[in-house]
Amino acid sequence: MPQYRSRTSTAGRNMAGARALWRATGMTDADFGKPIIAIANSFTQFVPGHVHLQNMGQLVAREIEKAGGVAKEFNTIAIDDGIAMGHGGMLYSLPSRDLIADSVEYMVNAHCADALVCISNCDKITPGMLMAAMRLNIPVVFVSGGPMEAGKVQWGNEVRKLDLVDAMVEAANSAVSDADVDRVERSACPTCGSCSGMFTANSMNCLTEALGLSLPGNGSLVATHADRKELFLKAGRLIVELAKRHYEGEDYSILPRGIATKQAFENAMSLDVAMGGSTNTVLHLLAAASEAGVDFKMADIDRISRGVPCLSKVAPATQKYHMEDVHRAGGVIGILAELDRAGLIHRDVATVHSPSLGAAIEQWDVMRHGEGSEPHRLFRAAPGGVATTIAFSQSMRYPTLDDDRADGCIRDQAHAYSQDGGLAVLYGNIAERGCIVKTAGVDESILKFTGRARIFESQDAAVEGILADQIVAGDIVIIRYEGPKGGPGMQEMLYPTSYLKSKGLGKACALLTDGRFSGGTSGLSIGHASPEAAEGGAIGLAQEGDTVEIDIPNRRIHLAVSDEELAKRRAAMEAKGRDAWKPLGRERVVSPALRAYAAMTTSADTGAVRDVSQVERK
């Protein structure tokens, strides 16, 4: 029988000093011997997705104590990618994922906690905590802060749904008045919660459901709804049960690595493809799988993307639907249920809350249950329509569910948007180890696209070029040296894509980068080109005016330059010595912290995970 980890610091005469310190935190004689549950919160007043989490840790803590555990809360950092976007702050976003993973590992291992509740929400926080959970491999439950309600504004004769991307696009469009920009800005982000579309934060919180590590409804129930409180309370009760099952019942199947198997990662990727999730999820799933010791690679993602249909399109792919609409249609379980009917998921994988994913689908799929059932009540939870930063502040309900699987927010396989999914992996001589495109956000007219390369050595230079009208229809904007090493930090390219839209070029141009894109990006935006330029990737050899061919249906991207010419260019680059594979003319201050990140990170095709062998002495 495995011993409670916490006994390392709570049992025996020699631990008198440690127990004295535990007593100073409020523990009593009755608490020693109980499982010590760490609560990793991520409250901050910087981020709307986390501004309402201040009391969530203690809400979970009280429930843990009622269930027979000892709760100890700590906090991680959390960066708002939207606020950090478009300036030097974005260099810190992806590196913060590793810091979050490290901080959770440090706190849990230093204090010998027995189990973990992860209270996350936004872009790098959920992945960072997920990586930590895989490293630690102790009982864990994820519960997120929930999505923001969609913004709404009267626009002519219609009510228009909004999100932060609309604010960026309209602000860059000189044809839009200052007054209208102000209206959009004030309406785009009305409540606390993670931004309302299928952006990175919501995509990742949905994927924790598919991985089996969070409760049904976690990914889609809006942050403001009173029903979300029950998810936090259930998480508190459940984690104590899981801890006792493992340490007292020798149940290893409920550990993160017992749940998040290769089949579970395949389920998560199938969900991602079906719902047209953020391209960043590829990066984070690869990283989490690496931490879990699961052999899950770009080749698996490519295989899944070819065989799983696109069943849902949510903002930014369309403004018709946001996360609140996904919830009304049955949430993550609703999408998984349609994949299940199509025979496209592994039903037998375990979850923290049900014997198997298949059992969870049977219990929570709204299409299997009638009016008045528990699933119907859960998924009728609606937005309140009132601007607020307060969690659980409203209890509105939809009068009916969206059960239209032919033309609703979630479709069945027969009515899919496409029979191959909303994400695709492209390969070619300019991205030999692959690159990623969110096909759910690409207009059908440009699924095949050939254009002229316009080379920029930084995101800043590209933005200047776009705003100065240097880009015309038919151009392919190449932004390089923005990968994990080259940035460093692999900046998101939301501003370049938003500005292309504002210039009327959203369906007339493409963008290729070794950086990445915000979950709010749509259009022919291809990221994660691997190997990156700073690692000797061929994207660093492309020249102004080269022809680039993009063929999404055939999963191909090609720099129309002969092998001989590429070899000449590579030889010329290598001849530069220490100046090889570095951006020309770019002046960027890179702090020691970011240089340390760059020294150990890897390209996007591996999840930009840390590889310490790069700095270890041989």
Curated annotation (Swiss-Prot):
Keywords: 2Fe-2S, Amino-acid biosynthesis, Branched-chain amino acid biosynthesis, Iron, Iron-sulfur, Lyase, Magnesium, Metal-binding. Its EC number is 4.2.1.9. GO terms for molecular function: 2 iron, 2 sulfur cluster binding; dihydroxy-acid dehydratase activity; magnesium ion binding. Mg(2+) binds at D81, D123, K124, E492. Signal peptide: none annotated. It comes from the Bacteria. It is an enzyme of class 4 (lyase). It catalyses: (2R)-2,3-dihydroxy-3-methylbutanoate = 3-methyl-2-oxobutanoate + H2O; (2R,3R)-2,3-dihydroxy-3-methylpentanoate = (S)-3-methyl-2-oxopentanoate + H2O. InterPro entries: Dihydro-acid_dehy_C, DihydroxyA_deHydtase, DiOHA_6PGluconate_deHydtase_CS, ILV_EDD_C, ILV_EDD_N, IlvD/EDD_N. PROSITE patterns: ILVD_EDD_1, ILVD_EDD_2. Binds 1 [2Fe-2S] cluster per subunit. This cluster acts as a Lewis acid cofactor. The active site is at S518. GO terms for cellular component: cytosol. The keyword Magnesium applies. GO terms for biological process: isoleucine biosynthetic process; L-valine biosynthetic process. The modification N6-carboxylysine is found at K124. Belongs to the IlvD/Edd family. Homodimer. Functions in the biosynthesis of branched-chain amino acids. Catalyzes the dehydration of (2R,3R)-2,3-dihydroxy-3-methylpentanoate (2,3-dihydroxy-3-methylvalerate) into 2-oxo-3-methylpentanoate (2-oxo-3-methylvalerate) and of (2R)-2,3-dihydroxy-3-methylbutanoate (2,3-dihydroxyisovalerate) into 2-oxo-3-methylbutanoate (2-oxoisovalerate), the penultimate precursor to L-isoleucine and L-valine, respectively. This is Dihydroxy-acid dehydratase. It comes from Chromobacterium violaceum (strain ATCC 12472 / DSM 30191 / JCM 1249 / CCUG 213 / NBRC 12614 / NCIMB 9131 / NCTC 9757 / MK).
